[in-house]
C-alpha cells in the first residue's frame, strides 16, 4: 500500500453497499511503523491483530501472522477475506503476498468476486491495473457477474479505466456482455462520459448498436447525459477504430496495450479520433478510406467532392465503383427536387388549375423539408465550441452562407406574397365579371337533369307502344 496518512473505505465493489458501513474493519489513520508479535495470541486476538495489520498495510506483520498458522482465507465479519479487502484498497503488495500464500483469487461473497472488487476499487488506475493483473494471473474469471449481472469490465468502464478494460478483454472478458438493465461496458462508459474508454472498447470490438432494456443505444445514453462528444462519435455510420485490436492474440494485445506507457501514446488515444475531419469521416462511412490520401493530395474538400460531375471524378482518378458509392450516398441525402421546367408556362395561361395547385403543394412541401432540416441541425450542434469533434473550416464561411440563405428566404417570402396577391386579384375580378362562364360542375348538373327527363319520357312512350302492339296481336 502506498505511503500515506489516510486510507479509503473498504466497501463492496460496484456500489453494492455491504451490510455494515465498515464491514467489520477499523477505519482510521495508518500507522506505517512495523509491528511484531510480543507472544502467543488467542485465536480471537489473532483475528483482530490480522485485521489491524491489513488495515495499516503492515506486510511484515501479515506474513508473521500467516506463519503462525492463521488461514490466508480467514473469514472476517460479513464474510470478507483478507484478499478481498486488499483488492478493495488497491494494495498491490498485500495482494501479491496473500496470493503467494495461497489465497483464493476466485472467492466471492454473495456473487461479489474479488476481481469485481478490484475493478471498482478507489485508487489510481496504475494500482488497480496491477491488482487486476495479479488476480487474472491466478485464474480469476473475468466473466463472472455480480447480482446485477455486471461483470468486471463493466465496472472498469464505468469508473474510467481503459487499460484495465483492455487487460480484461485480453484475458477473455466478453466485451458485449449486458447487465440486468441491458447495459454493456460501452453503455456504462458512454453514460459516465469516459471518452478514452469508449474508444478503447470500440477498438476491442464493442457493438455500439446494442440497446438497453428501454431501447436506448450507447450514443443515446451519452446524449441523455449531455456527453455530446461521445454522442457525435458513436452516431457515425462507421467508426474507423472499430475492431482494430480484435484479431490480435492475447499476448500481442497485452504487449500493445500495456507496454506503451509514454505521454505521447496516452495523448494519441483520443487524437486518433479528433484528427478525422468531415471528409475522412464521410469516406470511412462509405468504406472508401483508401481515397483519403488521393483526395488530400489534390486538395479536394468534402464540399467539392459532393458537387463533382462525372468527368471530374474520372479526371481525379476516382474509379467507377467508388463513384457509384458516392453518387448513391448523395442520392440518399438529396431532398426531392421540384422539376419546375416540366410545368407549363404560367405566362401562356395554358396551365390547368390542378397543375397549378400541384405546383404550389410541392413548393410548400419542399419548404417544410428545409425547415425540418435546419431545425435538426440546430438541435444537434453543440452549444460550446470545445465540444465540436470534427475539424471545421473558418466559421466565417458558414456565417456568410447563412447570410445568403436569409437573403434568399426573404426574397422567396416577397415573391410568394406577390403571387398570393395576384391570385386574390384574379379571383375577385372573376366573381365580379358579368360574362363569367359557370364552372363545369354547374353546367353538367343542369344537363344531367334534362337528360334524365328525356330518358323517362322516351321509356314511357316505348312502354305505351309495346302495350298497344300486344293488344292488337291478341285481337
Swiss-Prot record:
Cystine bridges: none
InterPro entries: Ankyrin_rpt (IPR002110), Ankyrin_rpt-contain_sf (IPR036770), Asz1_SAM (IPR042650), SAM (IPR001660), SAM/pointed_sf (IPR013761)
Pfam families given in the database record: Ank_2, Ank_4, SAM_2
Domain of life: Eukaryota
Region (Disordered): 1-24
ANK repeats mapped onto the chain: 45-74, 78-107, 110-144, 148-177, 181-210, 214-243
Signal peptide feature range: none
Domain SAM: 272-334
GO terms (BP aspect): cell differentiation; male meiotic nuclear division; regulatory ncRNA-mediated gene silencing; spermatogenesis; transposable element silencing
Gene Ontology CC: one annotated term: pi-body
Keywords of this entry: ANK repeat, Cytoplasm, Developmental protein, Differentiation, Meiosis, Phosphoprotein, Repeat, RNA-mediated gene silencing, Spermatogenesis
Cross-referenced SUPFAM superfamilies: Ankyrin repeat, Pseudo ankyrin repeat-like, SAM/Pointed domain
Localization of this protein: Cytoplasm
Residues carrying Phosphoserine: 17-18, 20
Role this protein plays: Plays a central role during spermatogenesis by repressing transposable elements and preventing their mobilization, which is essential for the germline integrity. Acts via the piRNA metabolic process, which mediates the repression of transposable elements during meiosis by forming complexes composed of piRNAs and Piwi proteins and governs the methylation and subsequent repression of transposons. Its association with pi-bodies suggests a participation in the primary piRNAs metabolic process.
Subunit architecture: Interacts with DDX4, PIWIL1, RANBP9 and TDRD1.
PANTHER family (alphabetical): ANKYRIN REPEAT, SAM AND BASIC LEUCINE ZIPPER DOMAIN-CONTAINING PROTEIN 1 (PTHR24157:SF3)
Protein name: Ankyrin repeat, SAM and basic leucine zipper domain-containing protein 1
Provenance organism: Neofelis nebulosa
Gene name of this polypeptide: ASZ1
Amino acid at each position: 500500500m502506498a505511503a500515506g496518512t489516510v486510507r479509503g473505505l473498504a466497501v463492496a465493489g460496484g456500489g453494492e453497499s455491504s451490510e455494515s458501513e465498515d464491514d467489520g474493519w477499523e477505519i482510521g489513520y495508518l500507522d506505517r511503523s512495523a509491528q511484531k508479535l510480543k507472544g502467543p495470541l488467542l485465536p480471537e486476538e489473532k483475528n483482530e491483530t490480522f485485521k489491524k495489520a491489513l488495515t495499516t498495510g503492515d506486510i511484515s506483520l501479515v506474513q508473521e501472522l500467516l506463519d503462525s498458522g492463521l488461514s490466508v482465507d480467514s473469514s472476517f465479519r460479513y464474510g470478507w477475506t483478507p484478499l478481498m479487502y486488499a483488492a478493495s484498497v488497491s494494495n498491490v503488495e498485500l495482494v501479491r503476498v496473500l496470493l503467494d500464500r495461497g489465497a483464493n483469487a476466485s472467492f466471492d461473497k454473495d456473487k461479489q468476486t474479488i476481481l469485481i472488487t478490484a475493478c471498482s476499487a478507489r485508487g489510481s488506475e496504475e494500482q488497480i491495473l496491477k491488482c487486476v493483473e495479479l488476480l487474472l494471473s491466478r485464474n480469476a474469471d473475468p466473466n463472472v457477474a455480480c447480482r446485477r449481472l455486471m461483470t468486471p469490465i463493466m465496472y472498469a468502464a464505468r469508473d474510467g479505466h481503459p487499460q484495465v478494460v483492455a487487460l480484461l478483454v485480453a484475458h477473455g472478458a466478453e466485451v458485449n456482455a449486458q447487465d440486468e438493465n441491458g447495459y454493456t461496458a460501452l453503455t456504462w462508459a458512454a453514460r459516465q462520459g469516459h471518452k478514452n474508454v469508449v474508444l478503447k472498447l470500440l477498438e476491442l470490438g464493442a457493438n455500439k448498436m446494442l440497446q438497453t432494456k428501454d431501447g436506448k443505444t450507447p450514443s443515446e445514453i451519452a446524449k441523455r447525459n449531455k456527453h455530446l462528444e461521445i454522442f457525435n462519435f458513436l452516431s457515425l455510420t462507421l467508426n474507423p477504430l472499430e475492431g482494430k485490436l480484435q484479431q490480435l492474440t492475447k499476448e500481442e494485445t497485452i504487449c500493445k496495450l500495456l507496454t506503451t506507457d509514454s505521454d505521447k501514446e496516452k495523448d494519441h488515444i483520443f487524437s486518433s479520433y479528433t484528427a478525422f475531419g468531415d471528409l475522412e469521416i464521410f469516406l470511412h462511412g462509405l468504406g472508401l478510406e483508401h481515397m483519403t490520401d488521393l483526395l488530400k493530395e489534390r486538395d479536394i474538400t468534402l464540399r467539392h467532392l459532393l458537387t463533382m460531375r462525372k468527368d471530374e471524378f474520372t479526371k481525379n482518378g476516382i474509379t467507377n465503383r467508388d463513384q457509384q458509392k458516392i453518387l448513391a450516398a448523395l442520392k440518399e441525402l438529396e431532398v426531392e427536387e421540384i422539376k419546375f421546367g416540366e410545368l407549363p408556362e404560367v405566362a401562356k395561361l395554358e396551365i390547368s388549375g390542378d397543375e397549378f395547385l400541384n405546383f404550389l403543394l410541392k413548393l410548400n412541401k419542399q419548404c417544410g423539408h428545409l425547415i425540418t432540416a435546419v431545425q435538426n441541425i440546430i438541435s444537434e450542434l453543440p452549444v460550446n465550441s470545445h465540444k465540436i469533434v470534427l475539424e471545421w473550416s473558418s466559421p466565417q464561411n458558414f456565417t456568410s452562407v447563412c447570410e445568403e440563405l436569409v437573403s434568399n428566404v426573404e426574397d422567396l417570402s416577397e415573391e410568394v406574397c406577390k403571387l398570393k396577391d395576384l391570385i386574390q386579384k384574379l379571383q375577385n375580378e372573376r366573381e365580379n365579371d358579368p360574362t363569367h362562364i359557370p364552372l363545369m360542375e354547374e353546367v353538367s348538373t343542369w344537363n344531367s337533369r334534362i337528360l334524365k327527363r328525356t330518358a323517362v319520357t322516351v321509356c314511357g312512350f316505348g312502354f305505351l307502344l309495346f302495350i298497344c302492339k300486344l293488344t292488337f296481336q291478341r285481337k
